[in-house]
A protein has these predicted regions:
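Conserved pre-catalytic core of RNA-dependent polymerases
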Residues: 59-62, 98-350
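Short, intrinsically disordered, charge-balanced linker/junction segments flanking boundaries
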Residues: 355-358
């Protein structure tokens, strides 16, 4: 009943994009033809998903970016997460501090014990029961409703749960997981500058289920149990944005009473999900999965070889960007990925603790 009430009284959705604008040589140029609109969007998003290549670790003379792309150098990756990796003196200072912090976290968590991932039929059923059936479709046309129907069959549920378990253990994802559909939304109504649009990625439903199982549940639980999440993140269960705001006000009041100099900076992490570096992120995941490389490689392969098609007011595009043949493989987590919010918390926890310990 509440669903029907909310659906009736809530604000209408932003319409699908039919035109975009770009600033070319200081002038605003508008595109209204389908091919031009799709090309402008794809060129912008291709740049967004390659921003993480500017991270110093990718340009290191040590070749860490290439060696750890799919955690190919297993020995080096495990040395970093166990704190036994010798960090060269010529490595960029911020990168060196982050690697040391990952090693400190690894010494606390990684124990060489059982790190198997098993997707049980009960967990699979519980996940799909909670989801909204009316979530937008991915490219394959398989959506949440298909899986919500499938969980009513006992054998089908067992097979689908076992499929995710096999994928996590083998590190080999289905080809369909590397095809995505992208929708652009206006952040500000009427403003259609392509760099001001929010990109939402629609992934395969079972890929998002996999991400939820690995990153949102198991990895996040490990991070919480280790008490590693700094209180600044306010990600504890029961905490709200209001709690964080009141805490900031209290902190400023205490600083004023103690006459202690203090600065509060509001910094927007622009394109934060789109520019997450996979080398650093994969090392954090590796720690929190107790060294389970295949489960992480599955996600990395899909995200780095993802081929994105575009959905606009004209329909779905025939052209795409990304894929295996791109000069700079794509990084980032993608909005619409169920692993993105918890992964951002996990990465932020490492960054905040790096600052605290230095």
């Amino acid at each position: 009943m509440w669903y029907l009430i909310k659906r009736t009284v809530k604000d209408p959705h932003s319409p699908s994009i039919l035109r975009v604008q770009r600033v070319v040589e200081g002038e605003v140029k508008e595109y209204t033809v389908q091919e031009d609109v799709e090309q402008a969007i794809q060129q912008e998003c291709e740049v967004r998903f390659s921003l993480a290549h500017s991270a110093p670790i990718m340009n290191s003379l040590l070749g860490l970016g290439e060696k750890l792309r799919y955690l190919l150098d297993e020995y080096q990756a495990k040395a970093i997460i166990t704190g036994t990796y010798y960090i060269p003196t010529n490595l960029e200072s911020a990168t060196a501090m982050i690697l040391k912090e990952i090693g400190r976290l690894g010494m606390k968590i990684v124990n060489g014990g059982n790190n198997e991932i098993i997707k049980k039929p009960e967990d699979f059923k519980r996940f799909w029961k909670k989801l909204n059936e009316f979530t937008s479709l991915s490219m394959s046309g398989v959506h949440n409703g298909h899986y919500k129907a499938a969980i009513w069959d006992v054998l089908g549920t067992k097979v689908l749960a076992m499929q995710l378990t096999v994928i996590a253990r083998s590190g080999i994802p289905p080809e369909s997981w590397s095809v995505g559909l992208q929708v652009m939304l206006e952040k500000i109504a009427g403003v259609c500058l392509v760099e001001k649009l929010r990109a939402i990625q629609l992934y395969e439903a079972d890929f998002n289920c996999y991400n939820q199982c690995i990153v949102s549940k198991q990895v996040m639980q490990t991070l919480t149990d280790s008490r590693y999440i700094p209180e600044e993140l306010f990600s504890q269960k029961g905490s709200t944005a209001e709690d964080a705001k009141f805490d900031k006000t209290l902190m400023v009041d205490l600083s004023r009473q103690a006459r202690q100099p203090m600065t509060v900076v509001s910094a927007d992490a622009a394109y934060c999900y789109d520019r997450v570096n996979h080398v650093i992120m994969s090392l954090v995941w590796l720690v929190l999965t107790n060294g389970n490389i295949p489960a992480i490689v599955t996600m990395l392969i899909c995200l780095q070889t993802m081929k994105f098609f575009q959905r606009t007011g004209f329909g779905e595009s025939k052209t795409s960007f990304g894929g295996e043949g791109t000069r700079l493989y794509m990084m980032g987590l993608g909005q619409g990925n169920r692993a993105a919010p918890p992964s951002w918390i996990q990465l932020s926890a490492v960054l905040v603790n790096t600052c605290s310990s230095n």
